[in-house]
């Protein structure tokens, strides 16, 4: 069914655009803009009827639309092109009109430094006239700017690296019938044709109403060498538009372009979309609104006052039920947390961890905490949730982020932990703005997290499976000690028993291959820790798609380096020469051992601690040992992903913003039913 719909759509929209390329020329035509061959930014948008709208009905806007791929103007022959487009500039009722529209040729489509208003969305005050701009444009301008030597508010101009046109003229076209130039109002809201032809170092610009033929005499004709403007011949072509205090709707209806002397593909006016006409408000409606406004305002004021009263009354309200009495010593008041975070103000926002937002809070006696706000529902699930929060508070280890307690409101749970001033480890590994961690600092962090996992698996009152070990869940305290946090996926079970998990969770790249079929165990935590070891030593994420294929999967790449007797080639290049080769090799080999796809071949965390401390040598294995260096990513259909509160998932707040939230390349935790 979906394939049939796609074919119907493809056939019905094929008439909108046609591309033609050869080794000698490139041409295309848009009869309406119903395809995705354009790169849009700013306020530019495609309307359902095929219109390309460059500027919206707001002040100080700019929009750009360019062909996605640059056009290769052959360097073996003089630069040449012809283009024909139809546009309409429709002033917003009550305004005189915006700052017009430009046809642009540029080596880049990055106009983030450009300004709206008189700079047309392609120039700015600091780059005017700079040859480094490499910019050519034909402007249809409807605002007079005396600073730019413009004589009226209805003109056509040729711009080269500068909004001050090298040549301009009032908008008009040569009428064959009248044998003279006839004025044309660019802001009439009616479709206008524009032709720009450049051949033999002569640039011709013509305009005409939609119903007229191409004028036999151009409006502007200038001898110029465009090849001197552009340092390269791969150039983008497209359009820009801008508004200032005056506002217009800027529309493009169709566009034809060719690098040949003649347009090989002509516009079909019968296929062009219609230009909408903005409606002015009726005077009676305006009068009625003026009469009703005081009444409406009074009602709004009363509603606001009532809302403020209700809000203040409920501001510090909490939810407390009889079953929570036994947890009273672990509970914070909502008022204290509200004041500590300044009302959860955006200035106190640290980031988003698993299942909630994290804020910094300053409690009395100079106690700084991190407060995570987690949504919840269901009384039974909440009982289990709070019970596990309190159980987690009983865990005491120098390399765990300490959980201090909780607070509960209707539909919301607040978790309080110690604040970690140096943020998350992944920020220091992957953010170029953060200081580079030395090898000695990294090695101490690795040994600390290994010790914390050994404690969770062996020494705690119950076995704790973390299930989401990665650099973004390791926080750094004031002394840069590693603290394992964000226990949003954690599970508890008695020693000697098995975890009764009903869902496989984790982050892609860190999940053991057997997780879906066999469920979580301490040995799946070991696998994730192995990936974490490689992540820290190599300064790379477990899966990266923007690199060479052989380096895409970290586990496989490290193993391949070992096979070539060049294991140290995989280390983080930011370490420079300040590292201990034996320690780096130990960490990488241990990472490969922990990520063995044969679960029984992985070491326990007690052995890992001994390996890292040097009290136990690594077992005899090589990069060719069965299960070493194999990466089998856990893949799941998106439809089966769930995040279940009632399955007792909870998240202790990380004490600073995690770069998992700030990096688009970093995978988010996944949970799906096994």
UniProtKB/Swiss-Prot annotation:
- Give the transmembrane ranges: 287-307
Q: Name one GO molecular function term.
A: G protein-coupled purinergic nucleotide receptor activity
Q: Which residues form a coiled coil?
A: none
Q: Where is composition skewed (Basic and acidic residues) in this entry? A: 663-674
Keyword match rRNA-binding: no
User: What Enzyme Commission number does this protein have?
Assistant: 2.7.11.1
Q: Which residues does the annotation flag as glycosylated? A: 124, 181, 185, 204, 225
Compartments where found: Cell membrane
**Record's compositionally biased regions (Low complexity):** 649-662
Show the GO cellular component annotation of the record.
plasma membrane
- Which Pfam families does the entry link to? Lectin_legB, Pkinase
Domain Protein kinase: residue ranges: 344-625
- State the superkingdom: Eukaryota
| Residues that bind ATP | 350-358, 372
Specify the signal sequence span: 1-22
Membrane topology of this protein = Single-pass type I membrane protein
Q: Where do the record's region annotations for Legume-lectin like lie? A: 25-258
Q: Which reaction does it catalyse?
A: L-seryl-[protein] + ATP = O-phospho-L-seryl-[protein] + ADP + H(+); L-threonyl-[protein] + ATP = O-phospho-L-threonyl-[protein] + ADP + H(+)
Which family is this sequence assigned to?
A: In the C-terminal section; belongs to the protein kinase superfamily. Ser/Thr protein kinase family.
The protein depicted here goes by the name Probable L-type lectin-domain containing receptor kinase I.5
Source organism per UniProt: Arabidopsis thaliana (Mouse-ear cress)
Give the classification, highest ranks.
Answer: Eukaryota, Viridiplantae, Streptophyta, Embryophyta, Tracheophyta
